[in-house]
A protein has these predicted regions:
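Phosphate/nucleotide-binding beta-alpha loop and adjacent structural elements of enzyme active sites
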Residues: 1-120
Length: 120
């Protein structure tokens, strides 16, 4: 277990909050990260991975999934999207390929993000 200073990688320090509760320096652990994204940038699990924790990373975007596979080969990295029912669906990816959602016009997404989205 690591006793190095805890470095936050998460966008809003969610990893710090979790570390206070889960104490990753004192025990081994396991996570399931749905919408894992980049393995370092804004990652809630990067600091835990540095401390020997492993997990399942669910990430449907190809580029992000490839990064996860390269950086976290000991993890289970799944290139899938999760939903309420089994089957196949459509995934709309914004032009920067940083975000995706299950429909062409989700009400919780700004219009500018929906413009130019590609169907995957």
């Amino acid at each position: 277990m690591s006793r190095d200073p805890f470095v936050s990688y998460a966008q809003n320090q969610e990893d710090v909050v979790l570390a206070r509760a889960l104490r990753p320096d004192e025990r081994e652990g396991f996570w399931v990260d749905v919408g894992a994204g980049d393995p370092v940038l804004d990652s809630v699990t990067a600091a835990f991975a540095e401390r020997g924790w492993r997990g399942v990373n669910v990430e449907p975007l190809p580029r992000e999934h490839e990064r996860l596979c390269a950086a976290r080969p000991a993890d289970t990295n799944l290139r899938v999207a999760l939903g309420a029912t089994a089957g196949q669906g459509r995934l709309f990816v914004e032009p920067t390929e940083e975000r995706a959602w299950p429909g062409p016009r989700c009400s919780d997404r700004p219009r500018r993000v929906n413009d130019g989205a590609r169907d995957r």
